[in-house]
Structures are given as structure tokens and as C-alpha cells.
């Protein structure tokens, strides 16, 4: 049987798209650069004193559960834990009082119940930084808990003299919806890789360290006080400098975030959408993300179109090629995901990878729709 020109072109196109969509995959790329290798870590004797700032606005129960892990870190150098709560929150004060009896490195400071022209989270960060006694500050939310007692040591191992930001990996508790955990992992692969390779763009959550002096010298959140969200994103985006960021991605450095509600998960997406236009380096960061999705969907569309056409025209060679490229695509994406799942210890089913990836665009559309329907004053502290 002779193969016509159209069939040859179609087969070549399918093969090319399979290759491109496999390469353009965040799970395929290595997250760490050579600079973040273990042999380049700071010696234990040279690790700095650290201040851990914990944001505890309305999270008393989780604060009580997580403080014990923070206060018993296996860290040889001095470190302090500063809890920032809301003034008048007696339950938070009780929790701090309970732990401060045995832990003299536990401190607290409080924000007023009402704050004008700045969100409570940003005000909490600013007060926590000012209350800190050390140059290096690690920022956490009370709903975050370190995965091990080695967490602080693994983060501090990246705090060398040439570094001003250290980003760690964070994901939701295994009880959270699998798609939420998949989405966080996929986004972290982009953000951690960018931080490790050149200049950090933003972060998905807490579990990062920065220098107190830079925060104070550059007036903290000045320039984005009008936004309710973005307390993590703006810090990374503003203070990141070229080749000045390092990442800590060993399992001991992981942080586990409590299970989010559906509303909380969507709110985080909405807040990000509201601030993205004011984040620097957005175009460069988004271009790779868009390219990955574009070629993934083009690949699937081409396979489906080729299969439908070949079935109608009884072009069995093209139909067989369509089936083969579909198998290769699914296999490639599962194997790439398995690599990332193992590295970040993600308890996710490999068989759901294709479905989760395919549904990304629908989740994006849902966020866009919610954002357009929302009151834009919900995203700003300046409501005059």
C-alpha cells in the first residue's frame, strides 16, 4: 500500500507534537540547578541564627498543633519563634502562654483587630520582621507544619553569604483533594526551578526565608499595600535578585499545609489573579507555562483529529499512528509525573495525571469566571 503525501505529513506532525509536548512538561524538567546540590550547602557550624515568624490570625487550633514541631527543631544555632496574632485573641494568647513556660525562645506580638489600608497578613509580616532579632527570617503560616525536625537545618543550609532568598517546597496535607495537591506540585515545579536557575518570580505559599535588613531598607510591602492578597508573592517578587535565590527541596525541608476548604483554595487563585499584573517578570514566567499547556492540548487535538479523519477515510496507517502516538503521549506524561511524585513524595495516583492535566484549562476558566463576577473591592484595602 502506497502512502500519500498527506498521510506522511500527518504522521510527521503527530510525531513532532508528541516529542514537543513531552519535552514541554514541567514534570520532565529538573528543578534543582548545580548550585543547589548538597555539596554546596553551608556547614552546620556556619549556619546563621534564624527567626521563624508565624502568622496566626484566626488559626488557634492549628497553631497549638504545630508549635511543638517548630520549637523542637534539631538546629544547633540559636533560633527564635515569633507568633504574630490578633490583639484580644485570648485563645492564641493561651496557646503561647502554654508553650512559653518551657521554651524561652518563643515570642509573640499582636496586630490590632482592625487595620486600615493594609491587610492583616501583610501587617503581621511587617510586625514580625520588626520584632525579629536575627538577620535571616523564615516565614510560615500557622496552618503550615514542618515535615520533620530537620526542616530548619535544611533551610539554613542554603543561607550562604551570596543568597538573599531561600525557597522551600510546600504542599497540602494528604487528606486534601488530590487535584489541589497535583496543582500545587505542578506550580511548585515551575516556581522552584525559576528560583534555582536565575531569578525567583513568586511562591505558592509560606516556607521561605529572606533577609530582615532588606525588608526594612526597602520598606517591606511599600508599592503593593493596596492589595488584600499577595503577602508571599510580593516578598519574593520584590526582593529576588539574579542568582540570589536558592531552593531547599529535600524531603526534610518540606512543609505540609492544612487541608483547604474549596472557598479558601479558590480565594488564593483569585487573589493571585488580582495581583499578577503588578508582579515583575510575569511575562517571562508565564510564557513557559502557556507553551507547556498549548503544546499539550495541540498534541491531543491533533491525535483526535487524525484518528477521526483516518477512521472516516479508512486510512489504517494514519489510524494506527494516531493510536501509537496517543499511547506514547500518555506513557510519557505518566513517567514524567512519576519522577516528580517520587522526588516530592506526592501520594497521588499516576493514572489520574492525564485527566488532571487535561482539566487545567477548565479550572482556569472557572477562576476567570469567578473573578469577573466578584466585587473588585474584595481584593483591595483601599475602598474609598
Regions found by a protein language model. Give the residues of each.
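Catalytic donor/gating beta->alpha subdomain of glycosyltransferases that bind UDP-sugars
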Residues: 159, 165-167, 171-187, 216, ...
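Short aromatic/hydrophobic "clamp" motif used to bind/position activated sugar donors
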Residues: 137
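Acidic donor-binding segment of Leloir-type glycosyltransferases
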Residues: 68-114
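Membrane-embedded multi-pass helical conduit in multi-pass membrane proteins
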Residues: 294-377
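Long helical/loop segments within the catalytic core of UDP-sugar-dependent glycosyltransferases
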Residues: 110, 115-120, 124, 155-222, ...
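N-terminal membrane-anchoring/stem segments of glycan-assembly enzymes
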Residues: 1-43, 337
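Acidic donor-binding/catalytic loop of UDP-sugar-dependent glycosyltransferases
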Residues: 141-157
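Cell-envelope/extracellular polymer assembly enzymes that use nucleotide-activated donors
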Residues: 48-51, 80
Amino acid at each position: 500500500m502506497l502512502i500519500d503525501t498527506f498521510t506522511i505529513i500527518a504522521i510527521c506532525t503527530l510525531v513532532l507534537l508528541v516529542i514537543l509536548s513531552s519535552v514541554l512538561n514541567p514534570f520532565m524538567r529538573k528543578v534543582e540547578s548545580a548550585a543547589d546540590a548538597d555539596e554546596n550547602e553551608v556547614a552546620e557550624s556556619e549556619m546563621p541564627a534564624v527567626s521563624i515568624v508565624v502568622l496566626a490570625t484566626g488559626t488557634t487550633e492549628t497553631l497549638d498543633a504545630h508549635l511543638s514541631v517548630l520549637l523542637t527543631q534539631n538546629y544547633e544555632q540559636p533560633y527564635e519563634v515569633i507568633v504574630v496574632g490578633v490583639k484580644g485573641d485570648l485563645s492564641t494568647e493561651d496557646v503561647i502562654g502554654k508553650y512559653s513556660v518551657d521554651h524561652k525562645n518563643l515570642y509573640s506580638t499582636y496586630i490590632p483587630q482592625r487595620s486600615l489600608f493594609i491587610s492583616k497578613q501583610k501587617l503581621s509580616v511587617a510586625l514580625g520582621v520588626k520584632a525579629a532579632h536575627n538577620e535571616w527570617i523564615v516565614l510560615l503560616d500557622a496552618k503550615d507544619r514542618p515535615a520533620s525536625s530537620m526542616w530548619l537545618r535544611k533551610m539554613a543550609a542554603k543561607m550562604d553569604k551570596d543568597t538573599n532568598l531561600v525557597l522551600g517546597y510546600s504542599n497540602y496535607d494528604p487528606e486534601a483533594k488530590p487535584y489541589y495537591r497535583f496543582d500545587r506540585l505542578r506550580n511548585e515545579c515551575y516556581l522552584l526551578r525559576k528560583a534555582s536557575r536565575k531569578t525567583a518570580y513568586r511562591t505558592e505559599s509560606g516556607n521561605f526565608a529572606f533577609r530582615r535588613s532588606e525588608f526594612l531598607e526597602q520598606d517591606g510591602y511599600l508599592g503593593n499595600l493596596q492589595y488584600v492578597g499577595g503577602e508571599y508573592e510580593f516578598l519574593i517578587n520584590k526582593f529576588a535578585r539574579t542568582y540570589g535565590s536558592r531552593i531547599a527541596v529535600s524531603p526534610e525541608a518540606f512543609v505540609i499545609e492544612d487541608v483547604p476548604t474549596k472557598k479558601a483554595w479558590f480565594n488564593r487563585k483569585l487573589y493571585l489573579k488580582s495581583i499578577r499584573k503588578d508582579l515583575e517578570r510575569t511575562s517571562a514566567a508565564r510564557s513557559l507555562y502557556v507553551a507547556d499547556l498549548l503544546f499539550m492540548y495541540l498534541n491531543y487535538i491533533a491525535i483526535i483529529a487524525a484518528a477521526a479523519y483516518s477512521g472516516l477515510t479508512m486510512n489504517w496507517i494514519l489510524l494506527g499512528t494516531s493510536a501509537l502516538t496517543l499511547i506514547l503521549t500518555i506513557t510519557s506524561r505518566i513517567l514524567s509525573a512519576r519522577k516528580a511524585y517520587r522526588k516530592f513524595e506526592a501520594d497521588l495516583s499516576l493514572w489520574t495525571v492525564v485527566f488532571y492535566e487535561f482539566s487545567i484549562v477548565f479550572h482556569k476558566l472557572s477562576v476567570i469566571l469567578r473573578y469577573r463576577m466578584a466585587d473588585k473591592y474584595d481584593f483591595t484595602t483601599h475602598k474609598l
